[in-house]
Design a protein with these regions (language model features):
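Conserved cytosolic headpiece of P-type ATPases
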Residues: 8, 16-18, 195-202
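Active-site phosphate-binding/coordination module
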Residues: 17-109
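Asp-based phosphoryl-transfer active-site loop
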Residues: 2-17, 180, 207
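Asp-based, Mg2+/Mn2+-dependent phosphohydrolase catalytic module
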Residues: 187-191, 204-242
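Non-catalytic pre-domain segments flanking phosphatase-related domains
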Residues: 1-6, 22-25, 29, 239-242
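Hydrophobic "anchor" residues on beta-strands that sit immediately upstream
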Residues: 3-5, 57, 195
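Conserved acidic, metal-coordinating active-site core of Asp-based
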Residues: 100, 105-195, 203-206, 213
């Protein structure tokens, strides 16, 4: 194993909350032995900030951005790709879906857009509280049931069950497997030497393309148990029983 790639929310952290001291310390131990990479749906700035500028490489917006955070905590965007995005058309489509699904009550904006061309359908709106988001669809079953209709409404986009209460839209062909495979080609790393760590390999999850491609995968069901789930990657302390 040469490269360990990570999802963020639900894997290393709670949804949009800072990286804990324990998981940060564990990542530091892993970084002494492996190359580490974040593969995220959000942009590199958001990911690096949430991680407290932990030194790591980052693929943001499903691979549309590539950045590094230095040992001193400096974020450098090394590649950024953008595609045109019709905000009016996407917002109108989201509004149609809201009426169809009964999601007409929301706080903030009905849709969220990123400079890259990625977009988001935040079911509860852009200003919903974290508590509201976490309570909305904890097992993702509500959104999975609606996923075929949402995908049909956005044929030019990859559509995923994203975050705690949203649907992510990324311009085709950008998804986490596309991003990871491209990174590996550019850096001379075989996919057979990659371990991916994520929390949602199921239908519609944004980790699913990586899982379905056969990349070695460790599924995390509680970010607080990350060190326990990945302990096999580190040598036993001297004197430990086998």
């Amino acid at each position: 194993m040469k490269l360990i790639a990570f999802d963020l929310d639900g894997t290393l952290t709670q949804h949009k909350t800072p990286l804990t001291a324990g998981n940060r310390a564990f990542l530091s131990l892993l970084s002494d032995r492996y190359r580490l990479l974040m593969v995220g749906a959000g942009d590199c700035q958001r990911i690096s900030s949430q991680m407290g500028y932990f030194p790591i490489e980052i693929l943001g917006n499903y691979g549309m951005q590539y950045a590094r955070v230095s040992e001193t905590g400096e974020l450098r965007i090394l590649r950024e790709e953008c595609v045109p995005c019709d905000h009016k058309k996407i917002t109108a489509t989201v509004d149609v879906l809201r009426r169809r699904f009964g999601f007409t009550s929301y706080r903030g904006d009905s849709a969220l857009f990123f400079r890259s061309g990625c977009a988001c359908f935040p079911v509860l709106g852009t200003e919903a509280t974290l508590e509201e988001k976490l309570a909305f669809d904890p097992d993702r079953s509500r959104r999975r049931a609606l996923l075929p209709e949402v995908r049909a409404a956005f044929p030019d986009y990859e559509v995923f069950v994203g975050g705690a209460s949203s649907f992510d839209l990324s311009p085709r062909p950008y998804n986490k497997y596309y991003a990871l495979a491209r990174f590996c080609r550019d850096n001379g790393v075989a996919l057979s030497d990659v371990l991916y760590v994520g929390d949602d390999p199921g239908e519609g999850g944004n980790d699913q393309p990586v899982y379905s491609a056969g990349v070695e995968f460790v599924s995390i069901d509680d970010y607080r148990k990350l060190p326990e789930k990945l302990a096999f990657l580190l040598p036993l302390p001297t004197g430990s029983a086998i």
